[in-house]
Amino acid sequence: MQIIRHSEQTLKTALISKNPVLVSQYEKLDAGEQRLMNEAFQPASDLFGPITLHSPSDWITSHPEAPQDFEQFFSDPYRKTPSPNKRSIYIQSIGSLGNTRIISEEYIKWVTGYCKAYFYGLRVKLLEPVPVSATRCSFRVNENTHNLQIHAGDILKFLKKKKPEDAFCVVGITMIDLYPRDSWNFVFGQASLTDGVGIFSFARYGSDFYSMRYEGKVKKLKKTSSSDYSIFDNYYIPEITSVLLLRSCKTLTHEIGHIFGLRHCQWLACLMQGSNHLEEADRRPLNLCPICLRKLQCAIGFSTVERYKALVRWIDDESSDTPGATPEHSCEDNGNLPKPVEAFKEWKEWIIKCLAVLQK
């Protein structure tokens, strides 16, 4: 295992900058926010630790990238920033997300509520769910894993056409595996930062995807018609578990972070670290490091205290209700399904420690 440690001065410069204007901006932050963010360069901090690499196949080793500090983020002329008329994140589900309509509806509300807390201060809205056939995307059966896959680039074109006027971005989510081009095996997600759209699949986050008993394999490899989407009818969907929900929330917020202009983090253990495989993605924390937190706060303008409180409320709320963020049709059940948040409990304890620092 390799540990990537930066010097105190390197981390301090990455967070605060040496640009007098940006230093002045930092000094105007709430005292508690400065106290929390300063944990970035405290060697003994138990809130923010170094990045650990476990194998040569990990992202940083296999995909060398230039690091992005706060000043580089702030000065990037191409990054997207929400405007008064474009402060909504839209989520578009493609295909069913659960084994029943009710489970599917609850799952999308859980994910929506999480995004609403994570990107605190922005509106998060749902577009009406659509079947795969509505996208007119290309699809195939993967030659190695024998599961169905839909073409990510085609979905991005579909989302771009559906993008509402007040949208900062539109993100599609699906339980069907994705591929970006014929020569690729798969991709977890793909985004167009210019167009403000992204598509992300949670198919490989089910506990059984890589097992011999995976039920999503198409038994007969036959040439499928490009216009016959009936193959997706009643296609296998993994069980919605706490781990799958955590992985879904982690991936979705990471990828939306890219749409804001946050590049892969190479400073500290952080949600914005790249991941090359599921084991590495599971190691990546749910939280942003102080450098990436400052970037997101700069883009949205939230109170860090209120954002963390909103995340704790999302974990604590047994109800899945997300007022104002559900499609107009109603559920047929008499109550909400319990939200499986067991996997988030450790992170809740971490947030409470951060709130203690913020509110000293």
From Swiss-Prot:
Q: What are the TM regions of this chain, as residue ranges? A: none
Residues that bind Zn(2+) 2, according to the entry?
A: 265, 270, 289, 292
The keyword Zinc belongs to this UniProt entry's keyword annotation = yes
Cofactor: how bound: Binds 2 Zn(2+) ions per subunit. One is catalytic, whereas the other seems to have a structural role.
Gene Ontology terms, MF aspect: metal ion binding; metallopeptidase activity
Question: A biological process (GO) annotation for this entry?
Answer: proteolysis
- Which SUPFAM superfamilies does UniProt cross-reference here? Metalloproteases ('zincins'), catalytic domain
Named cofactor requirement(s): Zn(2+)
Which keywords, in A-to-Z order, does the entry hold?
Hydrolase, Metal-binding, Metalloprotease, Protease, Zinc
Q: Which domain of life is it from?
A: Eukaryota
EC id? 3.4.-.-
| Positions of the catalytic residues | 255 (proton acceptor)
Question: What family name appears in the similarity comment?
Answer: Belongs to the peptidase M54 family.
**Record's function text:** Probable zinc metalloprotease.
| Database matches in PANTHER family | ARCHAEMETZINCIN-2 (PTHR32205:SF5), ARCHAEMETZINCIN-2-RELATED (PTHR32205)
Q: What is this protein called?
A: Archaemetzincin-2
Organism annotation: Pongo abelii (Sumatran orangutan)
Which gene specifies this protein's sequence? AMZ2
